[in-house]
Amino acid sequence: MQPTSSPVKVGVIGIGNMGWHHARVLSLLKDANLIGVADPNEERGKLAIDQFQCEWFKDYKDLIPKVDAICIAVPTLLHHKVGLDCLNGGNNVLIEKPIAANELEAKSLIEAANASKCLSQVGHIERFNPAFRELNNIVHNEEIVVLEARRHSPHADRACLLYTSDAADE
């Protein structure tokens, strides 16, 4: 992608929780112009029009030719199909994690990105979180030997996950 003085025209496909977050952040960036969002849910689409002053597309394929880059925030089972459509349309893409539902689809998306010469990235956004960056420094400097993390989430299906690792056990 060539540097440009004009804002990059971007779109978001899927405006559930993560897609809404992407649209919100993109609408605030001076180097990005949120052209539109695509989602089959008309109610969410109308809310996005009001909130982000952008277009809403019921069919994501109508958004593809209008933008340079797209955030894909649809359910994982649709990542492959939507990702291929965007890459084949010449769009740079950010695909929410995981990249695809299985290894075969992931490899297919990587091959399509390479063939299209488009930029593609998986949305591992936590790596930019200041707390995670500092923790990464601490772990790599071997300043701790035990790490316990708890994830708290309003989403019942993701709540109460517990991960522990004790370096002394290894």
Q: Where are the model-predicted features located?
A:
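Alpha-helical structural signal in soluble globular domains
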Residues: 25, 29, 48-51, 85, ...
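Beta-loop-alpha module in the N-terminal Rossmann-like domain of NAD(P)-dependent dehydrogenases
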Residues: 22, 54-109
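Conserved small/polar residues in nucleotide/adenosyl-binding loops
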Residues: 163-168
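A contiguous active-site-proximal alpha/beta segment in oxidoreductase catalytic domains
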Residues: 100-158
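Conserved acidic residues
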Residues: 35, 68, 145
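N-terminal Rossmann-like dinucleotide-binding module
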Residues: 1-51
